[in-house]
Amino acid sequence: MSSKAKLEEIPITVDFSGGLEMLFDNQRRHSISLPAKDTEGKPVTIAFLIDYICKKLMKDPRTDLFVLDNHIRPGILVLINDADWELEGEEAYEIQPNDNILFVSTLHGG
C-alpha cells in the first residue's frame, strides 16, 4: 500500500525569490507533494503546479502579482532543476519526483 501511495503523489520543492516569497507567507522554500495525475488522469505539469500554488500555497490575495490570465506573469523567471523552463517545455513540462521549481521575480519597483 505504501508503494502505491508513493506512485499517487510526487514530492517536489518549490522556491520563490526576488520578492515573490511575500505572496507565500514570506516563506522561500516549500516542500510539497502533488498528485501524480490531474483530474483528467494525465501527468501533472507546470500549468497544474501554477494553479495548485495559487489555490493551496498563496496566502496573499494579490494573485495578479504571480499570474496573469492563468499564466505566469511576464517578468517572472522559472527554473526547473536549474534550467530555464523554456528549454523544458514551459507549462507543458511534466513534473518528476524530486524536481526543484524556482520562481524568481525580475520586476523591481523604483
From Swiss-Prot:
Under which pathway is this protein filed? Answer: tRNA modification; 5-methoxycarbonylmethyl-2-thiouridine-tRNA biosynthesis
Q: Which UniProt keywords apply?
A: Cytoplasm, Isopeptide bond, Metal-binding, tRNA processing, Ubl conjugation pathway, Zinc
Which Pfam families has this protein been placed in? Urm1
UniProt-annotated location(s): Cytoplasm
Query: Where is the cross-link described as Glycyl lysine isopeptide (Gly-Lys) (interchain with K-? in acceptor proteins)?
Result: 110
Some GO term, biological process aspect, for this entry: which one?
A: protein urmylation
Give GO terms: molecular function aspect only.
metal ion binding
Which CDD domains does the entry mention? Ubl_Urm1
Concerning InterPro entries, the annotation shows: Beta-grasp_dom_sf, Mopterin_synth/thiamin_S_b, Urm1
Which residues are reported to carry the modification 1-thioglycine? 110
Q: Which GO terms describe its cellular component?
A: cytosol
> What are the coiled-coil residue ranges?
none
PTM info: C-terminal thiocarboxylation occurs in 2 steps, it is first acyl-adenylated (-COAMP) via the hesA/moeB/thiF part of UBA4, then thiocarboxylated (-COSH) via the rhodanese domain of UBA4.
What binding partners and quaternary form does the record give? Homodimer; homodimerization may provide an autoprotection to the highly active C-terminal residue before attacking its substrates. Forms a conjugate with the target protein AHP1.
**Main role?**
Acts as a sulfur carrier required for 2-thiolation of mcm(5)S(2)U at tRNA wobble positions of cytosolic tRNA(Lys), tRNA(Glu) and tRNA(Gln). Serves as sulfur donor in tRNA 2-thiolation reaction by being thiocarboxylated (-COSH) at its C-terminus by the MOCS3 homolog UBA4. The sulfur is then transferred to tRNA to form 2-thiolation of mcm(5)S(2)U. Prior mcm(5) tRNA modification by the elongator complex is required for 2-thiolation. Also acts as a ubiquitin-like protein (UBL) that is covalently conjugated via an isopeptide bond to lysine residues of target proteins such as AHP1.
Family listed: Belongs to the URM1 family.
Protein name as it appears in the record: Ubiquitin-related modifier 1
Q: Which organism is it from?
A: Chaetomium thermophilum (strain DSM 1495 / CBS 144.50 / IMI 039719)
